[in-house]
């Protein structure tokens, strides 16, 4: 990997956004022979700092297959906790959904990895390529596109000329705004409070999701006797909770977990993030494509946010490799439309499911509560339906790109 800052850099693909999806895209593309430049406004050291992001991500089985195929997983594996079971409950109800990896019999449902360790692994793999340039910290000043290509001018004066621009720069995407791609937004008036805990008893690789009137409360297993918590709460209460003393906050956390993990202790910081649904009406424009949160940001209720972004990556890499093989322009709208058509339907289904589940479970109305409890009991008893939900959790439903099946692409 080279990190020089020339006045004009010529590259096949320029990526704005050096987060987890952006770096995965860079590696996937470079691993298949493309010359790639990545731009991010945050210094590399900050992206891997303990204080930058306290979140952990549930990586579906298919996402892990992708990361293995492009050589990232060996750097992540020591920090990855297999998810062997998922238990979903409706508040204090004794009825619950239970998903067990042994039912499908071909590996865990997924893995939990702290975002910091994922970023470190991605940077380690990035350094093995001489066809990736990383420009950071750099801020985009302007973007221009024409039939010949795209030019991204940075505030430092550096210009990056390329055939294709990828916007992987999050919900507030500069690239999406430049392309004037409209979005729809739903505000849930909820925040996700995130922290990690150490606990006395083993989690046994089980992920728990409890639906409470204020929103879901997730207990997600990490390596060792540790878990990551995602506590969804009504936005107007979040400042009060975040300002609690360490002892009072820990007491609230322990009360919500219950006693099954024994004594619990909050370790590290606590973070709060607003929760909303946002999706672009189109993922592509001339010589431009959106990936990940720049295209779609969803409720964390399903743990699928990063997985959707990695599916985008796998699909786009396959589309571009196929186009290059037959001599097509990788920035052509006809090529990029293949990517958009592949991903739009799958992503839209996830928007609808996560939005519906959040609305269905984030209340305590008696008849609705009874109906959803009976629904969970029915899913537990109907094996094909239960297996369908498990396959969704593993990311193995639908027309999967080859990389999500762990297969490399022919040049």
Annotate each language-model stretch with its function.
Residues 53-77:
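N-terminal glycine-rich dinucleotide-binding loop that anchors FAD/FMN and/or NAD(P) in oxidoreductases
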Residues 11-38:
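N-terminal Rossmann-like FAD-binding beta1-loop-alpha1 element of flavoenzymes
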Residues 30-52:
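Glycine-rich FAD pyrophosphate-binding loop
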Residues 67, 149-153, 158-270:
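Conserved FAD-binding catalytic core of PHBH/FMO-like flavoproteins
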């Amino acid at each position: 990997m080279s990190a020089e800052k020339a006045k004009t850099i010529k590259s096949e693909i320029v990526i704005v956004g050096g987060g987890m999806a952006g770096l995965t895209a860079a590696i996937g593309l470079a691993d298949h022979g493309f010359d790639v430049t990545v731009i991010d406004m945050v210094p590399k050291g900050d992206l891997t700092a303990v204080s930058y992001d306290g979140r952990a991500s549930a990586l579906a089985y298919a996402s892990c297959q992708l990361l293995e195929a492009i050589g990232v997983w060996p750097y992540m594996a020591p920090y990855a906790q297999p998810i062997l079971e998922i238990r979903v409950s409706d508040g204090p109800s004794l009825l619950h959904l239970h998903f067990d990896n042994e039912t499908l019999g071909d590996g865990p449902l997924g893995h939990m990895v702290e975002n910091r360790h994922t970023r470190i692994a991605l940077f380690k793999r990035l350094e093995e390529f001489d066809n990736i340039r990383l420009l950071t910290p750099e801020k985009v000043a302007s973007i221009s596109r024409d039939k010949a290509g795209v030019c991204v001018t940075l505030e430092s004066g550096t210009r990056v000329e390329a055939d294709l621009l990828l916007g992987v720069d999050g919900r507030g995407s500069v690239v999406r705004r430049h392309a004037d791609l409209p979005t729809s937004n739903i505000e849930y008036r909820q925040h996700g409070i995130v922290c990690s805990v150490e606990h006395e008893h083993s989690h046994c690789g089980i992920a728990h999701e409890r639906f409470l009137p204020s929103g879901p409360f997730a207990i997600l297993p990490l390596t060792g006797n540790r878990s990551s918590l995602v506590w969804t709460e009504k936005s107007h209460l979040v400042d009060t909770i975040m300002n609690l003393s360490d002892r009072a906050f820990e007491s609230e956390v322990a009360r919500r977990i219950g006693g099954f993990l024994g004594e619990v202790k909050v370790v590290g910081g606590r973070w709060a993030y607003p929760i909303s649904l946002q999706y672009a009406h189109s993922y592509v424009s001339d010589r431009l494509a959106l990936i990940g949160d720049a295209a779609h940001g969803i409720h964390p209720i399903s743990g699928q946010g990063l997985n959707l972004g990695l599916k985008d990556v796998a699909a786009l890499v396959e589309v571009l490799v196929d186009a290059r093989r037959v001599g097509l322009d990788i920035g052509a709208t006809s090529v990029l439309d293949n990517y958009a058509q592949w991903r739009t339907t799958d992503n839209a289904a996830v928007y609808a499911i996560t939005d519906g589940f959040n609305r269905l479970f984030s209340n305590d109305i008696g008849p609705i509560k009874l109906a959803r409890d009976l629904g969970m009991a029915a899913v537990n008893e109907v094996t094909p339906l239960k297996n369908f939900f498990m396959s969704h959790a593993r990311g193995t439903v639908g027309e999967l790109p080859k990389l999500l099946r762990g297969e490399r692409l022919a040049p």
